[in-house]
Amino acid sequence: MKQRFCILIAAIAMATTTLDAQTDLKTETYTAYILNDVKRWENLTRRCEQQTDTTDIASLMSLIHCYYGYTMMLAEEKQHNAVERNIARAERYIAIVLAKEPNNAEAIDYSGVFTSYAVSLNRLKAPTLGRRSRQLIDRALSIASNNPRILFDKGNSLFYPPAIFGGDKRQALKYYRRAIDVIEQQGATSRNWIYLKLLLLEARCYQATGRHAEARKLYERLLDREPNFKIVRQKYLPEAVEAAK
């Protein structure tokens, strides 16, 4: 009886530690995102990498998620050398997951996203890499059609490329709205950086399609929700205010 009790206590302690780590990661990725802080993303990713158990799928997926957010910001900042290093690292971890779970939808999606990051490194390969990226994201979506992060990435695959390479901001908006709806239905909006990014991209779609007043209202709503959302306050809201005049 005593041995069973000790095993139970150990299991509870392990579960609590895992939950605390997940909560910390959620808070830290959220903070790095709203502050638009590349260094914070880097430190978080390095720390997560040091603590990752590469035999554990959940641990690997948390690390890949850090690389995903960190590399997204590096790509936006056009830090190409760092992007290239991160792609190599992340793809190595994704390969470990897919070797164990070939139909892991989130890992397949991550593979598609990191392929898309490589487009900025070699424009000559943009058509081939872009097509490969879209195929992977579409495959992930066929496995998990209501996964909000995969819906988000499907939207990104339509938002960022020019029209000649399949870009379509109106279609992107539909996927962003679907992802937003899923997150809100799940009650998962608190300290969720993907949710804030989705709302930001919804507003950017409005701007890109001439709906400037709607964009301005959504940016203002975002700042009401998160006053420290740096890029909205410094860049996107002023642009929308000017465009709406």
Positions of predicted regions on the chain:
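Structural signature of alpha-solenoid helical repeat junctions
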Residues: 55, 62, 82, 103-106, ...
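N-terminal leader/linker segments that initiate helical-solenoid repeat arrays
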Residues: 19-77
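Flexible helix-coil transition and linker loops at the boundaries of alpha-helical arrays
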Residues: 48-62, 93-107, 138-147, 180-193
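Residue-level signature for tetratricopeptide repeat
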Residues: 31, 66, 73, 114, ...
